[in-house]
Design a protein with these regions (language model features):
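Pyridoxal 5′-phosphate
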Residues: 4-7
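"…together with the soluble PPM/PP2C metallo-phosphatase catalytic core" -> "…together
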Residues: 10-229
Length: 229
């Protein structure tokens, strides 16, 4: 399958070439903005003392600035803004519009992501109580699930069957999103580890969604790869 994808990528086809331009442009925007934002966020974090001190969970011997996620969020937001503007200008057919047609509200998804970032920044600055942080994550996850990003079911690994979750899609999705956010937070004991693992996961998602011709999801994946590098 991967060989087939690689081969078709080099055969001229207007639609295929257009989506690869999508990938390159959004990757460049996300990467460039994140790269430019890192020193700014770093300076602000150092100035206000928002740093990780050496401790039992950390291998660093000196303080490391927090809030790296803000720079990544800036890259993500910039790439999505460029995509949205170019879709409105009819520069290219819009995979985000496609997502809207399939019941996914991208604006709602971005609001949910923004809420998660806000909770993370506040926690970095003043260390939120676990209950308050957990509540903020749940609210953000509910917003994302309500925007149409749902785990509708899953395939049984050792058979051809599929379990359809039905109304359970909402609570299962919320639990998954909150759990995922906290898992990433827990492994963030080494500088760059969380971003590296997220980037590797995004690479896998990109390959899968390109295979399934899910251009909306593959664009999100390529932007994630760019901000994690």
């Amino acid at each position: 399958m991967l060989l087939h994808i690689s081969a078709t990528a080099f055969v001229y086809n207007p639609n295929i070439m257009l989506i690869w331009w999508h990938y390159l442009i959004l990757f460049a925007v996300a990467f460039g903005v994140t790269l430019a934002a890192v020193p700014v966020v770093r300076s602000v974090a150092i100035r206000y003392g928002v740093v990780d001190q050496p401790g039992a969970r950390r291998v660093n011997k000196e303080p490391i600035p927090r809030m790296g996620g803000v720079a990544m969020y800036a890259g993500l937001l910039a790439a999505f803004a460029v995509e949205y503007i170019l879709e409105l200008a009819h520069v290219w057919p819009g995979p985000f519009s496609l997502a809207q047609g399939s019941g996914v509200n991208m604006l709602g998804v971005m609001i949910g992501i923004t809420l998660i970032v806000i909770v993370g920044v506040i926690d970095d600055v003043q260390s939120l109580r676990p209950g308050v942080k957990f509540l903020g994550q749940i609210i953000a996850a509910i917003v994302i699930a309500s925007s149409g990003v749902l785990m509708s079911g899953f395939k049984i690994p050792l058979g051809d069957g599929r379990v359809v979750l039905g109304w359970l899609s909402y609570p299962v999705t919320v639990i998954y999103l909150v759990a995922f956010a906290n898992i990433i937070n827990l492994i963030d004991g080494l500088d760059g580890l969380a971003a590296g693992i997220t980037g590797i996961g995004a690479c896998g998602l990109f390959i899968l969604t390109v295979t399934l011709v899910r251009n909306d999801a593959s664009l999100v994946a390529i932007v994630l790869i760019a901000v994690c590098i």
